[in-house]
């Protein structure tokens, strides 16, 4: 707009009066009407892009001597403030001495400072205003509160709240709304509730502020209660209200209330085609009512990208991956273009199927249609590639990122963990720390398992200190991850200490503690914690049951396992396929193969886990034929494809009965018939198969033929075979590898020492013992359990402190005699050095350890 156009617009209105009156003696029309009409034009120019036109209007007013009164001057000042022209604003403010005219000029400048991000200047200008004796009004405080929130100045908010209360403005809905929103931003609920109660006239806007604040703070029950009070006060909800309450219904799965709200939306006449339709779709989807969601979707006159996204994300979050992909195809067919949110929601379904080619196709679509790769889509792509085993593609995406934040770093860390690249995962975390990005909860939960796997206890303690410093130690998910990390590092005492410190223990934390105790050779502690869990009022789930059954299997304690089995039947938990599979394992390890088979036969649903459990049970009891029959039944009749665990159990079964040919045949069948690549465990099992049969050359050739470096388990298996068959030369090769791969494992030192002792190489035995002392490796004593009259008794190898130790060893000698009659030939005790050979030790003190060695290897 030019100055000429302004003149043309107002010339007809001024012309009749110019003839009769000089401008200096203007009429009331010129004094009041013209400035007020021009003020509308000034308001229209209150935009940074229209600053030039605003200055032209100002010039027009000056040329025609229309400006000069406080009303017009304040409007001009407001225009400059809205345009962010602080130099012109300051000139007018001080030249025309608007400092004491009214509060409006001060408010204009304060709001302009806040709007343009000059937050400290806004607060400073407020205090300058107070120095000039100008009192703030209800328009002043919302801007100041907004500035304090942006500056994260919580004390400033408290100061403003006290000032508002002292001035009696806390009952004003606009001032109260700004303060309520500020306190809720910091997660405070008590103060906003008091402020809300003091407001005299509560309208829908302030109710929406309160309800959305409750939802943001996680006080979902307060949202429902507040909405009920709002309805009783006869305040009509609007679309914002319904969106908030429907989101709470979706989060808490309150489908009945959600359906009632749907009816209320229809009755109230709120625009259904707005955001409410998406909130309703999300609510029905999250509550698992996909039929209703689909009907609602089909009834819509138009479905935009957001609406399609609601349906796709609902299917994905409910685990219905195939349906989400079908809906995506339908979206493309209908001509609606997907956006970044669409693919961020869809990619987890691609990850579920681990289809790398499909992942690449989606990536190509994103690039071809120039869809913006924001942080969330980038992390979703990285996560999808990692889960589809496309590690190099994920690395390429990360390297091409212009900017990365904690979300992308977390995707990389968890992706490396998923693919077993633990060192890379740890290096990525170190990179995150190096670039001074603070890890969030998900990052910590992702990196703690890596530290546990790598046994990096020192780093784990440092990270635990960081967690305490940041106040994350009371979060259940992080607490569980810390417990898991310490347990994997062999520090169960610290794990239990962390568990005891948790202020709130949910079912996940209890399950984590039970599982770790069961896996760390402390099954009795696992059962004790399982009992404590029940006493504390936490309901058991399938994970709790499975962990406790594993502990019973490791003790073994068949009586307690039977009690848990009865509990499962009574509380309808016996239909869970994973719990039943653990039950099979428990009965088998307790020696009751018949009960294990009965559980398997009565299972309504059988998956690969349950078949593997029963195959392993038969194999461990030396029933290879039964294992093979079950294998063929699984493949041919049930149509279930065997996995890596299946073949591991079959080869292990062959190992138990010494059927080398059958074991080798199944090992080859893995790759040739099923395309399954053998892992370290399979090679270790084949080495053990050859080793037990005395075919050490073939065992060593198997190790050398491995397509990847053998781990400590493989070399340890070979070393055990060398000790058994007195092959010192090959034992030297295996021991040198073990010293590099796992120098802290005492079991390998014992194997090496026994191999040398077999060959009467006492000097080498002494060296091994000295090496153990030098590296501070403590020999872990052997333990055994026996259950008598529903009570489990623990025995320690070589223990003479028990008051009835002489009677115990006498009984062991009697049992040894019975074993000899059955054909068992015990391995005589081999001393760690020649001087010890002069001492006499009862063989029975070492029977338990020697009998456990083959299973341990």
From Swiss-Prot:
> Per the record, which residues fall in region Type E motif?
714-789
Q: Which domain of life is it from?
A: Eukaryota
- State the Gene Ontology BP annotations: RNA modification
State the Gene Ontology terms under molecular function: RNA binding
Span list, region Type E(+) motif: 790-820
Q: Which UniProt keywords apply?
A: Repeat
Give the PPR repeat ranges. 102-136, 137-171, 172-202, 203-237, 238-272, 273-303, 304-338, 339-373, 374-404, 405-439, 440-474, 475-505, 506-540, 541-575, 576-606, 607-642, 643-678, 679-709
User: Has UniProt tagged this entry with the keyword Repeat?
Assistant: yes
InterPro entries per record: E_motif (IPR046848), Pentatricopeptide_rpt (IPR002885), PPR_At4g14850-like_plant (IPR046960), TPR-like_helical_dom_sf (IPR011990)
What's this protein's family per the entry?
Answer: Belongs to the PPR family. PCMP-E subfamily.
What this protein is called in its record is: Pentatricopeptide repeat-containing protein At4g21300
Organism for this UniProt entry:
Arabidopsis thaliana
